[in-house]
Amino acid sequence: MTQTLADMRRDYTRDGLTEAQSPQEPFALFHTWFEEAVKTEQPPVEANAMTLATVDEEGRPHCRVLLLKGLDAQGFTFFTNYESAKGRQLAAHPFAAMTFFWPALERQVRIEGRVEKVSAQESDAYYQVRPLGSRLGAWASPQSRVIADRDELEGLIRQTEQRFADTQPHCPEHWGGYRLLPERIEFWQGRSSRLHDRLNYRLINAKWARERLAP
């Protein structure tokens, strides 16, 4: 018999998450979890894949999967076309949320905060280490705009290849990075019978406060 959606579930059986196991600030815990995800998750799961949520001018939410490309004491960095839908939304409402899910570890991390552009130098530094096809694509693709068909996109790629046939492409002004400056980070560890562990960190007056949330 075909399994119904109502019957689709799994019980989580890995270790829990206690306050004694957790540091007073969230970045150290995220680093630990991320390193474990890199070692544990297998393709097609990418440990640095996350869902980014933004809102448009009408307050309607939009979400999509991106790759985390930078992490430091300031926040979490990703790159995109500034003229894309997400870029326009962040220009109007510079706040976002991101979620990481690592199924092999039965873990999830939710992050919320203000978003700002990184410097042009930081954007260029990352752009230059991307594969050539990706660098050309940043010039060729009018991201999030309506196009006629795949042939139109292929034509734009050919034009861009011809444009940069004798030189390396440089980082376009309409493409670059954003850094999410976290104000809230929640760590979720799956537990049996849906009685999950949730440790929530909130930034209050430049200091992190830790609290446990009911599942």
From Swiss-Prot:
Q: Where does substrate bind?
A: 9-12, 69, 126, 130, 134, 194-196
Co-factor binding comment: Binds 1 FMN per subunit.
In terms of InterPro entries, this protein maps to:
Pyridox_Oxase (IPR000659), Pyridox_Oxase_CS (IPR019740), Pyridox_Oxase_N (IPR011576), Pyridoxamine_oxidase_dimer_C (IPR019576), Split_barrel_FMN-bd (IPR012349)
Please state the Enzyme Commission number of this protein: 1.4.3.5
Q: Does the keyword Flavoprotein apply?
A: yes
GO process annotations (BP)? pyridoxine biosynthetic process
Q: Which UniProt keywords apply?
A: Flavoprotein, FMN, Oxidoreductase, Pyridoxine biosynthesis
Which PROSITE patterns does the UniProt entry name for this protein? PYRIDOX_OXIDASE
Catalysed reaction per UniProt? Answer: pyridoxamine 5'-phosphate + O2 + H2O = pyridoxal 5'-phosphate + H2O2 + NH4(+); pyridoxine 5'-phosphate + O2 = pyridoxal 5'-phosphate + H2O2
- For FMN, which residues are the binding ones? 64-69, 79-80, 86, 108, 143-144, 188, 198
This protein's assembly is summarised as: Homodimer.
Please state which protein family the record places this protein in: Belongs to the pyridoxamine 5'-phosphate oxidase family.
NCBIfam families for this protein: pdxH, PRK05679.1
Q: HAMAP family of this UniProt entry? A: PdxH
Q: What does this protein do?
A: Catalyzes the oxidation of either pyridoxine 5'-phosphate (PNP) or pyridoxamine 5'-phosphate (PMP) into pyridoxal 5'-phosphate (PLP).
Its protein name is Pyridoxine/pyridoxamine 5'-phosphate oxidase
**Underlying gene:** pdxH
